[in-house]
Structures are given as structure tokens and as C-alpha cells.
Amino acid sequence: MASEKPQDLMVTCTAPVNIAVIKYWGKRDEALILPINSSLSVTLHQDQLKTTTTAAISKDFTEDRIWLNGREEDVGQPRLQACLREIRRLARKRRSTGDGDALPLSLGYKVHVASVNNFPTAAGLASSAAGYACLAYTLARVYGVEGDLSEVARRGSGSACRSLYGGFVEWQMGEQADGKDSIARQIAPEWHWPQLRVLILVVSAEKKPTGSTVGMQTSVATSTLLKFRAESIVPERMKEMTRCIQEQDFQAFAQLTMKDSNQFHATCLDTFPPISYLNDTSRRIIQLVHRFNAHHGQTKVAYTFDAGPNAVIFTLEDTVAEFVAAVRHSFPPAANGDKFLKGLQVAPVLLSDELKTSLATEPSPGGVQYIIATQVGPGPQVLDDPHHHLLGPDGLPQRDL
């Protein structure tokens, strides 16, 4: 753990994106970020999608500062401040209990943070979850805080607590008013279902018009469907989804994933005024998935959409190549044919004429910008090599950030 030696007061970590298959939408406490229902997610592999964060503390720093993707941001942002306060509170608490490893001097030091995503920020790719999980995890190592970090990460972004673990993760809504029991826990490790694959169909990398925070507040205030969903639908779905994962029941997993995505977006439409995160391409992808499955006479592919138009596709290893070919057929790459597929290697295959007929889609060139092929992955990692630091010895971002 970090000590008072200057070189030990800089830590760099990475954290993953997670994709909910049972959705979180709506808070019962805005300040503590406590959800109106439990949720369940899949952690994606950091080889393809991750946030990298460096945090440094020094007696020479005069103020807290943060840089995101190379640009300095307002460190006074309320959720960022909530994370910093919570970590420092835990560090003080640890010190007051007489823990010999707690940092005696550094609690008063200011912190500099630099963070970068290797994927589009604020485009419905769960960037805030990875970002705040990485912040919490990195700050914990700098300040010598151990134990569960759900509360710290949750203060930044609710779903961030799910990115603190790899594999398949449940965020329990909890019952206590102070949120102490609203925590994330792993229900299966990343190696549990090795055949499972994930494809992210990037429809738009633009910032979404209605942010998640505002969207949730409006839905909680106006949607009766959301209340019914949280109280009467989600509890049973959490049990069923856990069973599907533990038993590797892909058919049931896939169908429930799609139904829950559809119901989440139905609550957005039930919100007043209505919110629509999906666009025409999103709806064409939904149609493509159902036609692909109908052709095969079984559910081989599932979609889910968060608060944005990008599709996340779940399938098994033996179906990836054919479905990627179906996407290429339906959404021919506009100009970047050789860069259309990123991430894991996928062998090209030819679609059968029968499948082309079943898809029956009018090609929509450029509708899908690119595909990221990935799989289930581990939780946050510490990067021990100092060459990975995003901050220089002076505590300022490295020039090549």
C-alpha cells in the first residue's frame, strides 16, 4: 500500500464498462444515489473498453484538480466532490482506528486526477460508470482505504458500483435510508461463461440529448409504469436472470435481456414529456435481431440498449461471425470497411441466400458506424509500471495525453 515516500503517492488504475441486463432507472434518494430497484450487469473486458485513471497527492499541490481526456474539468462538480469527500472520510476513519498503514500526513494533501476513456464519452456507452469506478478504486489506493467501495463509486454514478467487479454483478437496491446496504456484489466471475460474447454496435458517438440524471428524475416524477416495474416486475426478474447466468441458459438469458431493455425504454416513453433514446437505426437493429432469431428457430442473439441509441448484442461464440455478417449486410460500412470491426478478431463468413431473404431489410449504409467485439472481463486493475501514469512528476498531465 502507498507510503509517505513521494514516488508512492501516485497510483494508476483501470476500470471496466458494465452493461446492465436488468436495468437501473430512477433513484429513491438523489443525494445518496439510491436506486428504486436492484439491477444486474455484465462487466466488459478492458482489452476493448476501459477508463484509465491516475491520482496523485502531494504537499506541493495547492488545490484539487482533474483532467478528463486531456481537458481540465471543474473539480467542484457535486458528484466528484461527493466521491472525494467519501474517500477522505473513510481514510480519516481508518486513521482514527489506529491502523498503522493509514497515511498520517497525506489526508490534508490536495489531489490531482487525470482520466482517459478509450471509447466515446457520454454516448450511451456507460462512460460514467467506468469513470467513477476507476476514480474510487484509484483514490482508495492513494489514500490507503480498503474494503467495499460501492458507496464511494455510487456517489459519482449509481451504476459505477457495478464496475468495481468483474464477471456478472448485482447492485442490491438495499432498504436502509442511509444506503449502507445498497452495494454491488459479484454473482459469477468473468470466467464463468467463456462462450458468451458481446458486440457493441455504435450507432452514434454524439452526446445524447437527454442525460441520464435528468431523464431518471422526470421518469420517477411522472411514469406510473416505472413505479410498477420497480415494485412488481424487477424483483422476480433479478432472481430469474441470476438463474440464467448461473446455469448458462442462453435462450432464457437472451429473451429476458431483450424484454427488460424494451420495458426500460417503454418507461421512458411513459415519462411525460416522453423521452426517446432509440433512433431509427436502433429500431432497425431490433428488427434485425428478431428476424435473425426467427430464421434460426431459436434465440441466438439478444440486444439491449441503455440511455442512448447504441446497441449491445449478446451472443455465443459460435454465432458471432454470422451475426456480424448480417450487420454488415444490413448496415453496409459507409467508408471505413477495414475499420468497421474493432476488438476481438471475427472471421468473415458469407451469409446464406436463405438468411438474406429472412432478414428482408433494405440496406442502410452507414447506419452503424462500427462494431466493437468483446467478451466478459475482470474488475479494476492496478497498473504498477510508472510508464502508465497519466500525470508527470509535477502532477500535471503528460503531454501525449
Swiss-Prot record:
Keywords: Acetylation, ATP-binding, Cholesterol biosynthesis, Cholesterol metabolism, Cytoplasm, Lipid biosynthesis, Lipid metabolism, Lyase, Nucleotide-binding, Steroid biosynthesis, Steroid metabolism, Sterol biosynthesis, Sterol metabolism. The keyword Acetylation applies. Residues 382-401 are annotated as: Disordered. One of its GO terms (cellular component) is peroxisomal matrix. It is an enzyme of class 4 (lyase). (R)-5-diphosphomevalonate binds at Y24, W25, G26, K27, R79, S157, G158, S159, A160, C161, R162, T213. Pathway: Steroid biosynthesis; cholesterol biosynthesis. The modification N-acetylalanine is found at A2. InterPro entries: GHMP_kinase_C_sf, Mev_decarb, Mev_diP_decarb, MVD-like_N, Mvd1_C, Ribosomal_Su5_D2-typ_SF, Ribsml_uS5_D2-typ_fold_subgr. Pfam families: MDD_C, MVD-like_N. GO terms for molecular function: ATP binding; diphosphomevalonate decarboxylase activity; Hsp70 protein binding; protein homodimerization activity. Its main location: cytoplasm. It comes from the Eukaryota. Its EC number is 4.1.1.33. One of its GO terms (biological process) is response to xenobiotic stimulus. It is found in: Cytoplasm. It catalyses: (R)-5-diphosphomevalonate + ATP = isopentenyl diphosphate + ADP + phosphate + CO2. Catalyzes the ATP dependent decarboxylation of (R)-5-diphosphomevalonate to form isopentenyl diphosphate (IPP). Functions in the mevalonate (MVA) pathway leading to isopentenyl diphosphate (IPP), a key precursor for the biosynthesis of isoprenoids and sterol synthesis. Belongs to the diphosphomevalonate decarboxylase family. Homodimer. This is Diphosphomevalonate decarboxylase. It comes from Rattus norvegicus. The lineage of its organism: Eukaryota, Metazoa, Chordata, Craniata, Vertebrata. The gene is Mvd.
